[in-house]
Amino acid sequence: MRISINYVVMSVLIIIFTAKYTENMNAIYIWQQTDWPNFTWDDAKLSYKLGKVRGLQGKLVGKMSALGFDLKNSAILDTLTADITKSSEIEGEILNSDQVRSSVARHLGIETEGLPEADRYVDGVVQLMMDATQNYMKPLTDERLFNWHAALFPTGRSGMYKITVADWRQGVEPMQVISGAMGKEKVHYQAPDSDNIPFQMKLFLDWVNDDQKIDPVLKAAIAHLWFVTIHPFDDGNGRIARTIMDLFL
């Protein structure tokens, strides 16, 4: 059920990006367009997909309401465990699913007998998701995002490399998405410069916390695209973008 809803969200992302990007072909990147970040979309194309989401949500609510307390907790535990492990897999990182399940169960107050104790990193990743899904009514602030980022990188490093943790990325080196061998690199995307991030994130957070009359699925899709476009952190942007999406869903 969750996979189907996320598939629809990604379809919405494609529709929004296509509509936005084709408005001004003179801009190299989406954030350089003159009307950034005023997103537009095609209601006719989205209405069917959003209707499918509501149908799936209705079925899910119906099934959950028919479950007893223990089965409902078990279903929530299974869903969160899968969501957390799959999000990390997207980044090429394989988490120990038993440790993830153990940490999620502990945060939910569910018996963890027979499960291994989660290590510091796994517990940090779980804390990130639990804060988003359990405290979804709280405002999203720069401090909250910094806490999420710190939970992802408790050692202050990404692999072997020291990174800026719990703060926006810094330095003059551009944040680029590149492919190709050394000397034949192709730049596919370049994010806003680091000195532009505080301004860009203020725009983003003001919009996120504004009580707009907008479908939560659509808001989740826009927020995901907007956040990864800014790419405000040295690392972990994809995982935090998906966590923001979960916050709205």
What are these regions, as identified by a protein language model?
Residues 1-249:
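FIC/Doc superfamily catalytic core
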